[in-house]
């Protein structure tokens, strides 16, 4: 049995962070966490590009364009959808999740989801690292690991049919 896993070593990886501007109090903290995690895992600052889009709903379209350039090993979507008094939250959350998943399935690189869907601003800030933990950092670490497992798959020897 052969086991292929991705490591958390980001040396030599090129990464992109796609960040929604709406709810910037939260998304800027996600960005700080993601950038810090990439740095801690060995991705050079010069190998990280940040792309900003107006809101979380727009993330999948920008994400798709960034992935299509073929310049990145890992791409992370960062945004925040906060529940209000209308069904808008459900629509946006569902469509963004589907959109990011669709891009991830078609991508030739690692794509990670760092989009918060929260019931309140307080909850969003907690998940963005104001109290503890940062979902942006977690998504960036997942992207590094995924990029490395995709590399391992590409290098895996072909098996003979029996």
UniProtKB/Swiss-Prot annotation:
Task: List the EC numbers from the record.
Answer: 2.5.1.78
Q: Which domain of life is it from?
A: Bacteria
Q: Which InterPro entries does this entry report, sorted A to Z?
A: LS, LS/RS, LS/RS_sf
Show the GO MF annotations.
Answer: 6,7-dimethyl-8-ribityllumazine synthase activity
Q: Name one GO cellular component term.
A: cytosol
User: Which Pfam family, just one, is annotated for this protein?
Assistant: DMRL_synthase
What SUPFAM superfamilies does UniProt report for this protein, alphabetically? Lumazine synthase
Main enzyme class:
transferase
Cite the annotated pathway: Cofactor biosynthesis; riboflavin biosynthesis; riboflavin from 2-hydroxy-3-oxobutyl phosphate and 5-amino-6-(D-ribitylamino)uracil: step 1/2
Sorted alphabetically, which keywords does the UniProt record give? Answer: Riboflavin biosynthesis, Transferase
Residue positions annotated to bind (2S)-2-hydroxy-3-oxobutyl phosphate are 85-86, 127
**Which GO BP terms apply?**
riboflavin biosynthetic process
Catalysis performed (reactions) = (2S)-2-hydroxy-3-oxobutyl phosphate + 5-amino-6-(D-ribitylamino)uracil = 6,7-dimethyl-8-(1-D-ribityl)lumazine + phosphate + 2 H2O + H(+)
Q: So where's the catalytic machinery, residue-wise?
A: 88 (proton donor)
Q: What does this protein do?
A: Catalyzes the formation of 6,7-dimethyl-8-ribityllumazine by condensation of 5-amino-6-(D-ribitylamino)uracil with 3,4-dihydroxy-2-butanone 4-phosphate. This is the penultimate step in the biosynthesis of riboflavin.
Q: What family is reported?
A: Belongs to the DMRL synthase family.
Q: What is this protein called?
A: 6,7-dimethyl-8-ribityllumazine synthase
- The protein's organism comes out as Anaeromyxobacter dehalogenans (strain 2CP-C)
């Amino acid at each position: 049995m052969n086991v292929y896993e991705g490591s958390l070593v980001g040396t030599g990886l090129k990464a992109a962070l796609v960040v929604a501007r709406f709810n910037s109090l939260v998304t800027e903290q996600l960005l700080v966490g993601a950038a810090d995690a990439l740095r801690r895992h060995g991705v050079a600052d010069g190998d990280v590009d940040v792309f900003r889009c107006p809101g979380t709903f727009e993330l999948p379209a920008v994400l798709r364009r960034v992935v299509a350039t073929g310049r990145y090993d890992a791409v992370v979507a960062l945004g925040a959808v906060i529940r209000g008094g209308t069904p808008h939250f459900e629509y946006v959350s569902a469509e963004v999740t589907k959109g990011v998943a669709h891009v991830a399935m078609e991508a030739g690189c690692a794509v990670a989801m760092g989009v918060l869907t929260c019931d309140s601003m307080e909850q969003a800030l907690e998940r963005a690292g104001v109290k503890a933990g940062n979902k942006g950092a977690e998504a960036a670490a997942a992207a590094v690991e995924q990029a490395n497992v995709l590399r391992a798959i590409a290098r895996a020897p072909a098996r003979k049919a029996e």
